[in-house]
Amino acid sequence: MSGDVIVTVTLNAALHVDYAVGEVGTEGTRPISKPGYRAGGRGVTVARVLRAFGHDVLAAGLAGGVSGELIREDLAKSGVPTAFTLIRGESRRTFRFAGPGVPETGEVAADQDRLAGPVLRFGEAGPYITTEELGRFAADYRRLLAGAAAVVLCGSLPDGLPTDTYGSLVTYAAEAGVPVILDAGGEELKHAVGHGPDLVVAETSSADPGLGAALRRLGAGAAAVTTGLEVRVVTAAGGWTAQIPAADLGVVLSPGRGALVAGLVPGQLLGWSWPDRLKHALALAAGGARVPGGLEGRDHVDLAAYERLLDAVQVVPEP
């Protein structure tokens, strides 16, 4: 292990622009609130959650334009150090319009009765990344590995990057002796898993008991496959399934994917048992699912829900 800092990489970071509206409808003109700006992208969320739990983190990736400046400024306000490689293009933006019942600030609601209003989302595709910009990022990334305890690679790739980009980043980390957690899907995952990431986190819309084992055969040290708030993990030592009973969940919005990935990192570094890793990660994911209207709070997790649900997570070994 080279250092003490957990480096998160978000190659398609986003600036979330949030508005509160009196009513969401299909016709007419409606007043909206002053916009709220927040840095986003799954790797950014992972960095926020880890920082909230006291871990030393560094958020890296690609950022450009006014949106890129606002991304870095927002992370600085959260106490998250950054080392983004600057690009000429404008970092992507998402626009979210929250109806009645969603706090204008996007902060975590104090009570569940405020989790009412609908949210409309619109998202830009993101910038085109040139070969020169990728080369500069790769050089920056390799320098960061010297002080990294682990690297977390997350999310989609922006236009211009080859599909094997994550594979190269996994290889660089392995050469530096730094463990890698990869959270990706589609072609990005397909081209990276053979490079031997220590842990792969993959998402599927339906239960696929064979996916984790397949990822292991392709080269992953361990594979965690998520379906909503259920996680199946396959490792060299065996497999486990973790879930939270519906009776304990209460109000559930969309699972906190970034929070779940963040929850798997400490156990990977500290050698926790897999049941303990899964309890921590799934309780965090459920806490992240309680953010009002899908507008994530400052630390992207409801800590009270996390503490309550930690003992409710059921982990069962696979036969």
Predicted regions and their residues:
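Glycine-rich phosphate/adenosyl-contacting loop at the front of the ribokinase-like
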Residues: 1-58, 250, 316-319
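Hydrophobic anchor at the start of a short beta-strand
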Residues: 6, 55-57, 82, 180, ...
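Anion (oxyanion) recognition and catalysis
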Residues: 51, 76, 174, 216
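Conserved N-terminal subdomain of the carbohydrate kinase-like
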Residues: 52-148, 306-319
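Short hydrophobic/aromatic-enriched beta-strand-loop microsegments
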Residues: 57-59, 79-85, 197-207, 241-244
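Charged helix-capping and loop-helix junction motifs
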Residues: 135-139, 162-170, 242-248
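Conserved beta-alpha-beta core of the PfkB/ribokinase-like small-molecule kinase fold
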Residues: 150-210
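Conserved phosphate-binding/catalytic region of the ribokinase-like
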Residues: 212-319
